[in-house]
Amino acid sequence: MAAKDVKFSGDARDRMLRGVDILANAVKVTLGPKGRNVVIEKSFGAPRITKDGVTVAKEIELEDKFENMGAQMLREVASKTNDLAGDGTTTATVLAQAIVREGAKAVAAGMNPMDLKRGIDTAVAAVIKDIEKRAKPVASSAEVAQVGTISANGDAAIGKMIAQAMQKVGNEGVITVEENKSLETEVDIVEGMKFDRGYLSPYFVTNAEKMTAELDDVYVLLHEKKLSGLQAMLPVLEAVVQSGRPLLIIAEDVEGEALATLVVNRLRGGLKVAAVKAPGFGDRRKAMLEDIAILTGGQLISDDLGMKLENVTIKMLGRAKKVVIDKENTTIVNGAGKKADIEARVGQIKAQIEETTSDYDREKLQERLAKLAGGVAVIRVGGATEVEVKEKKDRVEDALNATRAAVQEGIVPGGGVALLRAKKAVGRITNPNSDVQAGINIVLKALEAPMRQIAENAGVEGSIVVGKILEEKSETFGFDAQTEDYVDMVAKGIIDPAKVVRTALQDASSVAGLLVTTEAMVAELPKDAAPAMPAGGGMGGMGGMGF
């Protein structure tokens, strides 16, 4: 086991605080509408330029092991906030730095670290209650756009795009962000259920120009197993022919005689039909087939349910307004399933998402949820260079996460105003223990930090801005760093999701509380470089060999 270096009390806290300051100072320059960019060197390719706090935090690794421990603890704040709320990472970092700094001073003055932490926790609980009380639900698409715009660093086009995507696919729908090959940033919305299986034969194509099979007002037959012969299906096929409607068959596979017969029927015009393989594998395939059955109002023909193909009637088939199938994908639009059944299924999938511990399973369940609940939107981010596209993509992802958070828990005035106004709630708390009270006062002071930083990044004195806002009675009065004016933040559309503000403070105080109560630090001693091998002197005693 390697020897360890141990630091205690003041020395440990000083080294740790240096690490905290290095990381926080690099991250906090990005805060607010006039925040600057940070350039990050990459081991290959062009450097990365970003204004995303967590991206900066993740890149910082310090040489001194004790300083690095402080920096890594602070990095944890940014990562945790990003995981839970998807935005607010810079705010969380600024809050954590403020709490750690004041906490370290208090400990150096001889206060009890555990009592300080109790005070910090008490104050944070009061702030969170205050934020939850002030939060207003998101009422309109315009408010969604405003949240997106603020989080995308004042880019109104991104805010509008996200609002448009959310309006189309609903709050449960999936919105993904991809890089575009062109200069433009655009939204591509897929309504209905889309899955990654195309037609089994090009003979099913109805639109030769686009090479797609388009079926209107279509019946959907869902079968769990392979179809190799159509004998058992003849009664239901005849019923479909008589109805004059097209048919989509979704099964594990359609092969041999069954596929040949369907193709011949399609070419002769007897039955307008298309066949695709079922999406997914194993248990997931069965679950997705059941989703399609509920969406289209049909039944899954499954051996588990004791159903045989020969007993299938036309009433057991699902129905949809339109189905579009290309070489690789199938999209079912406007299934005829009952709304109550779809909602029940959505509730069931949500419960599974809550219970699962696997990130992969959670992602797949969320995809299924989106396909049932609304649809999928893809925001394709364009730009002139790869560096620009990556920087813009960071901002779009932040904005998307912020708008989702706003829909979940509502909105509060932005620009650090919500935290500043929460000082009133903290100011009402008193504790007879002076050390606990000192912990409460640490949070009281830290609540000003985000607003000060936003102002300072805009080139304005932070303490003057904070003082002027606290003098005003209006709860929504704040400082617009973009125009350097004092405005009504909500009326101006400068709003933050309550969830982002709450999560930032919770995560910051949690890690900062641990740093304040640290009394010793242990790190591995650097290993001495091994001595170099002596230079080879050749073989001795070869002089008398006549060479």
Swiss-Prot record:
GO terms (BP aspect): protein refolding
Disulfide bonds: none
The keyword Membrane appears for this protein: no
Major place of residence: cytoplasm
UniProt KW keywords: ATP-binding, Chaperone, Cytoplasm, Isomerase, Nucleotide-binding
Reactions it catalyzes: ATP + H2O + a folded polypeptide = ADP + phosphate + an unfolded polypeptide
SUPFAM superfamilies in UniProt: GroEL apical domain-like, GroEL equatorial domain-like, GroEL-intermediate domain like
Compartments where found: Cytoplasm
Tagged with keyword Zinc: no
Family designation: Belongs to the chaperonin (HSP60) family.
Protein name listed in UniProt: Chaperonin GroEL 3
Organism: Bradyrhizobium sp. (strain ORS 278)
Source lineage: Bacteria, Pseudomonadati, Pseudomonadota, Alphaproteobacteria, Hyphomicrobiales
